[in-house]
Amino acid sequence: MRMDKLTSRFQQALADAQSLAVGRDHNIIEPVHVLAALLDQSGGSTRPLLSQSGVNVPALRERLGEALDTLPKVSGQEGNLSIGNDLNRLLNQTDKLAQQHGDAFIASEWFVLAAADDASPLGVALRAAGGDKKKIEAAIDKLRGGETVQSENAEEQRQALEKYTIDLTARAESGKLDPVIGRDEEIRRTIQVLQRRTKNNPVLIGEPGVGKTAIVEGLAQRIINGEVPEGLRGKRVLSLDMGALIAGAKFRGEFEERLKAVLSDLSKNEGQIILFIDELHTMVGAGKADGAMDAGNMLKPALARGELHCIGATTLDEYRKYIEKDAALERRFQKVFVGEPTVEDTIAILRGLKERYAVHHGVEITDPAIVAAATLSNRYITDRQLPDKAIDLMDEAASRIRMEIDSKPEELDRLERRLIQLKIQREMLKKEKDEASRQRLADLESDIDKLEREFSDLNEVWKSEKAALQGTTKIKEQIEHAKLELEAAQRRQDYAKMSEIQYGVLPQLEKQMLLANEVEHHDFKLVQDRVTAEEIAEVVSRWTGIPVNKMLEGERDKLLRMEDELHRRVVGQEEAIKVVSDAVRRSRAGLSDPNRPSGSFLFLGPTGVGKTELCKALADFLFDSTEAMIRIDMSEFMEKHSVSRLIGAPPGYVGYEEGGYLTEAVRRRPYSLILLDEVEKAHADVFNILLQVLDDGRLTDGQGRTVDFRNTVIVMTSNLGSHQIQELSGDGSAEAYTQMKAAVMGVVQAHFRPEFINRLDDIVVFHPLDKAQIKSIARIQLQGLEKRLAERGLKLDLDDPALELLGNVGFDPVYGARPLKRAIQSQVENPLAQQILSGQYTSGDTVRVRTEGGHLAFTKG
């Protein structure tokens, strides 16, 4: 017999049989070796073939193992291995059967058929396990589908649909698919296209996360429930697994062979199968090599003839990029656009899915949580689509509650740690012999006893609460399972089973659920199993950094005292602080316009009066860190071409992939303070970009992504009108301020365009600083020096006359507070540094600073 006339699978089985014989010290290869190798072959057709013909495969494998154990073993042989007479005879019989059926290559199924009525131990074992020649022959005919074996790889291509597709209708029948709520219009349109005579192939196009795959799952569920037109009843929806199709296709033509086998199996089923290709664009170019045909081109003839009933799904961008370029492929599909559902539709979808997620996590999901998931995700998570982002929110919030139930409560954990500390102390005190130690040990023992009792009581409470929650989870799972069984019985029209479930099993389970809920209605002390709107808000805050969760009392008080907090760092400038504080309070109370930034201001004033310092203080107040402020020095954007640095370079330019300086910063931290410093120095084109941000709270970057600025506070600083401010500042009265602001606005209107000024929430003019304010600033700035000295173990004691002197030296009405910093450096820091280095002060000393003859004098305190 020529080995090259065997199929590759049969050749592999013979090689495995040889290895099996060598491993067991057999010097003759028998038929049992070959069948054992065929049964153990991964992806082979022998095991499913025998199962279909009614053979008990595990029992057969066991009998083969016993037969192998009885074969004689040979030790010390020199590798002489031969084919036994029984195997030789069976192989000849296999060859004969293959020729009778017109096969060019000998397939492994003929070996199984030849063994069915053979007198060898293999035949006996096969018949004992339920093997019947006629049944095996019928199973072979069904497996081959009337085709002959004409290629070496013919066995690889069998059962292509089972290997390379996932049966969605079977999954829907077994209740493994999530329910699909709404989307009736899209499903109806898909069915309409599928009912056409030719080009009956819909392609679902929509943004990622809008539910394209869910529509096909909904169609599969409708087919199972018989809620489709006559033309689609009884059809199967199979999802093509592109990963399985491509994986392991090592040689050229292997991928095409697999795809051809799938198409061949589909055409045999004569329109009874609808093929779903998720990520349809992957078919274009798949398997493409020099001169080879890609998968998209192989599909075209089958699509055009109507042999292939297909549903595709892809995103808008990928459809444009891949499918539209291939006009011949595009015209064979009918577009069905899937839009993003509204917030109301999303709430309905979440209500339908709620039970599945509640059972999976073993928690209760409240209706306010569902409404919050839809509304908050729509408002704050702008770079993703509904309903996907809302489902993710609900899922993560439920996961968080489940994790808290499973892990030890904080109170118990704290008690346990305290107990460990006390027990360590007890062991140390046991080694001491003095009376005081014995007394402390006795006190410690009583503390440990008290804590252990408290810990034990709490632990019991936690365990009982946890057990109560787990009980309801189990009942929920049983109810879910009973409902699935009821649906299956309804489809089979098994009225006895339906009656048993509907009037027996379900009411009993619901009664148990009611009793369990009554136990749960007592407020649990340590665990919580309800997902509420607060949990959803907490997850949104963690995702985006935007504080949308319910404000704690402490935070409310902090916001009401915001002006006082800012005045600790910024001296004077009442109007500016009031305007900024009001904007933040509006935003946190949820009253600000949801389609504009939380606040947009232009700060005007001479240099050194606190414009930038107020922004730093605000960032520190909001985020507890000045690092959270996005600071952009607008003097860097004086040229026209530098505008692209803010939003990213356009396509074709260097740096296109990197994104913009402003847009990337806001995408990473959507809740932030943006400081555009020295804004008048920027090129006029920068303001064209800012118009969109100030009006709509959004900006499109160089890559076409929309960046959300609605949760930012935008502050621009400028020195415009400084001369007028110095001249007209007057006595600080309201009239003088109004007159000064009018003069400054004249300068501002001459520099900025009306459409830019009109979009700002407020223009704030800062006052020049007077001597009293400079003195207060000196006190604030010296606090930084005190901190640095404290790190070295030194204290600073500076009296009022010394502070007055510093204020006088550092006062300059033109330059504001900046000369004060230089005055502190020259008058205090420089002489103090010399004295510390010379060893005059050591750790623990106090540095006294006093005035002597118009100068500052330093003494050790």
Swiss-Prot record:
An annotated GO BP: cellular response to heat
A Pfam family matched in the record: Clp_N
List of residues binding ATP 2: G605, P606, T607, G608, V609, G610, K611, T612
GO MF: ATP binding; ATP hydrolysis activity
Keyword flag Chaperone: yes
Example of a GO cellular component annotation carried by this entry: cytoplasm
Matches recorded under InterPro entries: AAA+_ATPase, ATPase_AAA_core, Chaperonin_ClpB, Clp_ATPase_C, Clp_N_dom_sf, Clp_R_dom, ClpA/B, ClpA/B_CS1
Record region (NBD2): 555-768
Start and end residues of each stretch annotated as Linker: 341-545
Region span, Repeat 1: 6-71
SUPFAM superfamilies, alphabetized: Double Clp-N motif (SSF81923), P-loop containing nucleoside triphosphate hydrolases (SSF52540)
NCBIfam families: chaperone_ClpB, PRK10865.1
Function: Part of a stress-induced multi-chaperone system, it is involved in the recovery of the cell from heat-induced damage, in cooperation with DnaK, DnaJ and GrpE. Acts before DnaK, in the processing of protein aggregates. Protein binding stimulates the ATPase activity; ATP hydrolysis unfolds the denatured protein aggregates, which probably helps expose new hydrophobic binding sites on the surface of ClpB-bound aggregates, contributing to the solubilization and refolding of denatured protein aggregates by DnaK.
Domain notes: The Clp repeat (R) domain probably functions as a substrate-discriminating domain, recruiting aggregated proteins to the ClpB hexamer and/or stabilizing bound proteins. The NBD2 domain is responsible for oligomerization, whereas the NBD1 domain stabilizes the hexamer probably in an ATP-dependent manner. The movement of the coiled-coil domain is essential for ClpB ability to rescue proteins from an aggregated state, probably by pulling apart large aggregated proteins, which are bound between the coiled-coils motifs of adjacent ClpB subunits in the functional hexamer.
Assembly and oligomerization: Homohexamer. The oligomerization is ATP-dependent.
Name recorded for this polypeptide: Chaperone protein ClpB
Species annotation: Xanthomonas campestris pv. campestris (strain ATCC 33913 / DSM 3586 / NCPPB 528 / LMG 568 / P 25)
Gene this chain is encoded by: clpB
